[in-house]
From Swiss-Prot:
Highly thermostable. Inactive towards methylviologen below 55 degrees Celsius. Heterotetramer of two alpha and two beta subunits. InterPro entries: 4Fe4S_Fe-S-bd (IPR017896), DsrA (IPR011806), NiRdtase/SiRdtase_haem-b_fer (IPR005117), Nit/Sulf_reduc_fer-like_dom_sf (IPR036136), NO2/SO3_Rdtase_4Fe4S_dom (IPR006067), NO2/SO3_Rdtase_4Fe4S_prot (IPR045169), NO2/SO3_Rdtase_4Fe4S_sf (IPR045854). Keywords: 4Fe-4S, Heme, Iron, Iron-sulfur, Membrane, Metal-binding, Oxidoreductase. Its main location: membrane. One of its GO terms (cellular component) is sulfite reductase complex (NADPH). Residues 277-305 form the 4Fe-4S ferredoxin-type domain. This is Sulfite reductase, dissimilatory-type subunit alpha. One of its GO terms (biological process) is sulfate assimilation. Siroheme binds at residue 224. Signal peptide: none annotated. Gene3D superfamilies: 3.30.70.20, 3.30.70.2500, 6.10.140.1420, Sulfite Reductase Hemoprotein, domain 1 (3.30.413.10). It is an enzyme of class 1 (oxidoreductase).
Length: 418
């Protein structure tokens, strides 16, 4: 009789099954051990299945609250997992997760992947997740005493890898494939992501802030890494000038596409006109939604004056609900050495570190303190593109240095009435 009858039910049906995959890994690890390979946790995946079966029966998790574990010199990158069934299932007494810093754009050679798998087969359960929600390679399940040798072996590979971020620190920056794959990329996402990762190693590996901080780089407004929904600091490619239009290519599309219904009427601001002969765009009304460019990529392309918009505050639910990032900087040049972006980042971190409450994300701090104070921190003027909705009250607040002297107020001061 099966040891895991409840989990076996999850193997049925035409859809992918995580149970099938864990069982495959369990068989491969046990086979490797039987062949005499140096495998430290041959029964790790099998033990995980046993614990999960018990959790389904008991209707509760059997993972303890966690614990602080890491490698020498690092404060993050490892998520502690301890089982309260350690005596019953010793294979999962320790089952820590390691986050491994992925390459920009998630480009791998098979050689790099084989190196990763060889290290993890030796020191861990063999279970991986490509990739976690932040973008890291996830190694699922190892013991405390195997963390350091696993980390050292990763660093000694011909194509070496480092640990990513976890805890209240800078999480591993991630980027779309950008100019390596996409014709719409408005800046080099791969280079910027790598540069930020290497510049902020201390912030990445040593938790020091109120809570996590995520950076994602999207090459164009299509935002294939969902940066506006999943990062505190989204760097989304955009352009300042007009969309480039090839009228001959537009006519080719018109021969088989209903431009009026598929493009013109779906423009969110009504910025496009098509008279059957010529396509015109009122670029002052364009909000860079990319719909027209996506529908007619041979005819329409982003403008030549390219850079990025910075959005702030995106996150999943925790203290407050899920939030989509909003505009903090409408346009920024994205050129090496990226000083403007780094100056904004460092100003934000200093302010957040000083003013933020425990487990308060940067967006929640801005909600609490106000966008006006945030703009002072980053040295920017208010812009209509930062406004989510029109104001709903008549009150306006000014700093003293913003007020201009007047004869009326001077007279009130003389009379002691000010």
């Amino acid at each position: 009789m099966s040891e895991t009858p409840l989990l076996d039910e999850l193997e049925k049906g035409p859809w992918p099954s995580f149970v099938k995959e864990i069982k495959k890994t369990a068989e491969l690890m046990e086979k490797a051990a039987a062949e005499g390979k140096d495998v430290k946790m041959p029964k790790g995946a099998r033990g995980l299945l046993k614990q999960l079966e018990i959790s389904y029966k008991d209707k509760k998790t059997h993972w303890k609250h966690g614990g602080i574990v890491s490698v020498v010199g690092y404060g993050g990158g490892v998520i502690g997992r301890y089982s309260d069934l350690g005596e019953q299932i010793p294979e999962v007494e320790h089952f820590h997760t390691m986050r491994i810093n992925q390459p920009s754009g998630w480009f791998y050679s098979t050689k790099a992947l084989r190196g990763l798998c060889d290290v993890w087969e030796k020191w861990g359960s063999g279970l991986t997740n490509f990739h976690g929600s932040t973008g890291d390679i996830i190694f699922l399940g190892t013991r405390s005493e195997y963390l350091q040798p696993c980390f050292e072996d990763l660093g000694n590979l011909e194509i070496p890898f480092d640990i990513g971020g976890s805890g209240s620190d800078l999480r591993t920056p991630s980027a779309c494939m950008g100019p390596a794959l996409c014709e719409f990329a408005c800046y080099d996402t791969l280079e910027l992501c790598y540069d930020l990762t290497m510049t902020y190693q201390d912030e990445l590996h040593r938790p020091m802030w109120p809570y996590k901080f995520k950076i994602k780089c999207a090459g164009c407004p299509n935002d294939c890494v969902a940066s506006k929904a999943r990062s505190d600091f989204a760097i989304i490619g955009t352009w300042k000038d007009d969309i480039k239009v090839d009228q001959e290519a537009v006519k080719e599309y018109a021969s088989w596409m209903d431009i009026e219904n598929e493009v013109v009427k779906l423009c969110p601001t009504g910025a496009i006109k098509w008279d059957g002969k010529e396509l015109t765009i009122d670029n002052r009304e364009c909000v860079r939604c990319m719909h027209c460019i996506n529908k007619m990529p041979k005819a329409l392309k982003p403008g030549d004056e390219r850079g990025a918009t910075i959005l702030i505050g995106g996150k999943a639910p925790f203290v407050e609900g899920a939030v989509i990032g909003w505009v903090a900087v409408p346009f920024v040049e994205v050129e090496k050495p990226y000083d403007e972006i780094k100056e904004i980042l460092e100003a934000i971190w200093d302010w957040w570190d000083e003013e933020g409450k425990f487990r308060e994300r940067i967006g929640e701090l801005i909600w609490r303190k106000g966008m006006r104070e945030f703009l002072k921190v980053i040295g920017r003027e208010a812009d209509v593109r930062m406004v989510k909705a029109p104001r709903n009250n008549p009150f306006m607040f000014f700093e003293k240095d913003e007020l201009k002297p007047s004869a009326y107020t001077e007279e009130l001061k003389k009379r002691g009435m000010w």
